[in-house]
Swiss-Prot record:
Residues 182-327 form the KARI C-terminal knotted domain. The gene is ilvC. This is Ketol-acid reductoisomerase (NADP(+)). NADP(+) binds at Y25, G26, S27, Q28, R48, S52, D82, E83, I84, Q85, G133. Belongs to the ketol-acid reductoisomerase family. Its cofactor is Mg(2+).
């Protein structure tokens, strides 16, 4: 049975009187730090000099190199990209942790796959908002919140559970509700969702649909509209009310096609492939591949990225988006 915690069920403020170092000031970092600060907590930022360092200072924070921020803190929230966390932890965080400190993460990758192995005398917990940082911040300022997951990997103090819940409340997540999980469950489900559905699955489905239409002689521009551009319309409907709302909102022709043709595309063989992807996540094969490629300068990663950018759908999309001024208000600035 899933357990969900809300504002009123967080009885103890285990963060009270503690200094929090947020390491990193990117998408999640700025949201966590600003929400915690607005809720009255003592927050410092740990980050290397650069644009994010300057932005954090401009936003009114005391900003330090990572090692100096960690030295001051009781709770250290690590919000850096997965591939650099291990190095930063080893060089700048670990030497400055003290017994009784707490080490926190918004994604369990490096703890679950033993890239980071904290000492036994610190708490280790997870608070993972289920939305990007800009949404975590925006909903907070509007008086609502994004739901989150939380969990405890190591309870050295005997109070790590309350500390994790208090942190979740501190960033505003308990307004919407937070679900208890484990580092293992959060990491494996998150990676699977990204690889099999949200990123890997969807992009391959779209590309294959685009190629099928173009190879059959249809205009690439029409193919783009039908298999990529309109994806947002369908996803928005599912986001708002699940598959039921989506199917209620489309034509009977589209709904009938959904039922009779969907299973021809996503066959039982595809599900077996999904299970193989999940197995590679569970047994560490994917993590080891990612970690090794990172050590080798991401040679395979960059090669795959370049190949993906060379696909015809990229150029067609770029041209068509110039016809759509309504997409000028971008969520992400490159």
């Amino acid at each position: 049975m899933t357990t969900v915690y809300y504002d009123e069920t967080v009885k103890e403020d285990a963060l009270k009187g503690k200094k929090i170092a947020v390491v990193g000031y990117g998408s999640q970092g700025h949201a966590h730090a600003q929400n915690l600060k607005d809720n009255g907590y003592d927050v410092v930022i740990g980050i290397r000099p650069g644009n994010s360092f300057d932005k954090a200072k401009k936003d009114g924070f005391d900003v330090y190199p990572v090692d100096e921020a960690v030295k001051q803190a009781d709770v250290v929230m690590v919000l850096l990209p997965d591939e650099i966390q291990g190095k930063v932890y080893e060089e700048e965080i670990a030497p400055n942790l003290e017994a009784g400190n707490a080490l926190a993460f918004a994604h369990g990758f490096n703890i679950h796959f033993d890239v980071i192995q904290p000492p036994e005398d610190v708490d280790v917990f997870l608070v993972a908002p289920k939305g990007p940082g800009h949404l975590v911040r925006r909903t907070f300022t509007e008086g609502s919140s994004v739901p989150a997951l939380f969990g405890v990997e190591q309870d050295a103090s005997g109070n790590a559970f309350n500390l994790a819940l208090s942190y979740a409340k501190g960033i505003g997540a308990t307004k919407a509700g937070v679900i208890e999980t484990t580092f293992k469950e959060e990491t494996e489900t998150d990676l699977f969702g990204e690889q099999a559905v949200l990123c890997g699955g969807v992009t391959r489905l779209i590309q294959s649909g685009f190629e099928t239409l173009v190879e059959a002689g249809y205009q690439p521009e029409l193919a783009y509209f039908e298999v990529l551009h309109e994806m947002k319309l369908i996803v928005d409907l599912m986001y708002e009310g699940g598959m039921e709302t989506m199917r209620y909102s489309i034509s009977n022709t589209a709904e009938y096609g959904d039922y009779v043709s969907g299973p021809r595309v996503i066959t039982d063989d595809v599900k077996q492939n999904m299970k193989a992807v999940l197995e590679d996540i569970q047994n560490g094969k994917f993590a080891n591949s990612f970690i090794e490629d990172n050590k080798n300068g991401f040679k395979e990663f960059y090669k795959l990225r370049e190949e993906a950018q060379d696909h015809q759908i990229q150029e067609v999309g770029k041209e068509l988006r110039e016809m759509m001024p309504f997409v000028e208000n971008k969520t992400i600035e490159k």
